Amino acid sequence: MKKRTAELILKDPEKFAHHDRVFLNNPVVMQGMGLAPLVVVATTGQNGLMLAVAVALLLVPSRVLACLLSRLVPLRDEEPTPEQLQKKLLPRALLYAASAAVVYLAAYPILNFVFGTGLLNLGIYLPMLVVEPLLTYRFGRVQETVHKAVSKGVRITVGYALLLLVVGVVREWLSLGTVFGAPVGRWALLPLAKMPAGGFIVLGILCAIWRAAAAKRKEYLKKEARDTLTVHYQKEGNREP
């Protein structure tokens, strides 16, 4: 671990973890965003894969487009006044939703070419990604740069896509005894897993395990950071005449 990274971890561990949208601060696991597709339609590995690809095609481009368009009605203050919010929130929300809709119209032919009629398994939840909080939640936040929009968008995409695949594979295995259609067991362990109620149960258990692992990882990083700085200071002390 580099000295600068170690200093950042020890100075503000939560801020350091906040930037890790894949594991330590996954928006679904830690904030409960984007639950509907996970619970309702991520019932198989194939469905999870289709949703993951759709999110990959939608999230970053729509976030960048919305970032550019929302400059027409920017929010500059971290804590805007009620008057500012009343004046700007509605047009910003419309811009973010419209940006996602435009990107969706461009991405759908690609999804249709890759997955064909399999997209029908996603039902209304595919177009509903346009108003998914993961795509639109920024409309009420302070204006961000294009670089930050791309950086955060990529990290959120990876974190969400990973969870979609994991949930889809686990639910398919539990409910059907298969993984991407290939048999991996003699019987279904939990047929309820293919239903939304089972989806909540599976997702809840996975989130609990994920959070526990993330907490362990944070503790490990802090310990490693302390050890790194200790070794660094010892080396500096040995160099002194």
Question: Each predicted region: which residue ranges?
Answer:
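Ordered, amphipathic secondary-structure segments that act as subunit-interaction surfaces
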Residues: L72-R138
